[in-house]
Amino acid sequence: FFECTLECDIKKEGKPCKPKGCKCNDKDNKDHKKCSGGWRCKLKLCLKF
């Protein structure tokens, strides 16, 4: 499992990529679960959609 906690906790464009406690492991990535503010965590990276 690839945890992307660090990547998702950092801020981009002044907005947090993901809320605390929002996990983004390999299983979640397959589901392409959205994070707050339209951010998605994919391949251990925070992407804005």
Swiss-Prot record:
Chief localization: secreted
Recorded superkingdom: Eukaryota
Pfam families, per the entry: Toxin_20
Disulfide bonds: C4-C17, C8-C41, C22-C24, C35-C46
Keyword vocabulary terms for this entry: Disulfide bond, Neurotoxin, Secreted, Toxin
InterPro entries linked to this entry: Hwtx-2-like (IPR012625)
GO cellular-component term (any): extracellular region
UniProt function note: Toxin that causes irreversible contractile paralysis into adult Aedes aegypti resulting in 100% mortality after 24 hours.
UniProt similarity note: Belongs to the neurotoxin 12 (Hwtx-2) family. 04 (lasiotoxin) subfamily.
Descriptive protein name: U1-theraphotoxin-Lp1b
Protein species of origin: Lasiodora parahybana
Lineage, uppermost ranks: Eukaryota, Metazoa, Ecdysozoa, Arthropoda, Chelicerata
